[in-house]
Amino acid sequence: LICKGALQEILNVCSQVRYNGDIVPLDEPMLSRIQRVTETQNRQGLRVVAVSTKYLPARSGDYHRVDESDLILEGYIAFLDPPKETTAPALKALKANGVTVKILTGDSELVAAKVCLEVGLDVGEVVPGNQIEHLGEDELAALAKRTTLFARLTPMHKERIVTVLRREGHVVGFLGVGSNDAPALRAADIGISVDGAVDIAREAADIILLEKSLMVLEEGVIEGRKTFANMLKYIKMTASSNFGNVFSVLVASAFLPFLPMLPLHLLIQNLLYDVSQVAIPVDNVDDEQIRQPQRWNPADL
């Protein structure tokens, strides 16, 4: 049986370690040595995956989780997964447009903090997943608002954080590429994945990014705000014109012995309004409406 995974998770199910060709107990001194070495690698931004084995008799049935116990730690693999070149400018552009960026990752605190430092994201306090497991919804909502970086998260942790942010009235977009991101992708208002993501992430996402550059996120935000602003213009113009027509006919009919406008006249007016509204989708939008997200407010009518 060969198992691989996050270092701490593998260490929890190992009782021995292969050292200089011999199998020795995984005692506290050895455990401390392993953790010191891997923490040094994490601080350098290297992700660490542990590998363990166990000899089991052959069987015809499936292997189960209970078999993952008393394993032998064979070693660990450290690899660098650098951020995309466009990550830093994309984060800066999103912040300038009023988008708050939060990092929800299954990586260790040290690796995640190192990557955030490289892309210029100020994270402050790092919250690991085990700290949010026993929090209530209100406590988690308050924590999610003030925290930028969550590390060592399970798929359910990510989903909970996205859900509480939505409950607080935020519009949440979640970008994920792995199978662990699928629950959060479904829970978000807008699930975003990339063309090279795993199948389950692409299926759970609402939008698939075909371009490699993350600057497409800023372009999408700006274009979406332009579309939303022009939709509001159309709704306000249509509602005000139709209300004016109907209200004037109702009031005039109450005091005049004749109809001030025939149905044909109303249809002609609507046609004229509709022709003028053809230009609204390509109308210019003010900078303040682009830089800050707008909300639909019926009172504006």
PLM region spans:
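Membrane-embedded transport module
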Residues: 123-174, 178, 188, 193-301
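Cytosolic catalytic headpieces and adjacent flexible linkers of membrane translocases
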Residues: 1-164, 168, 182, 194-196, ...
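Cytosolic ligand/metal-binding cores
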Residues: 185
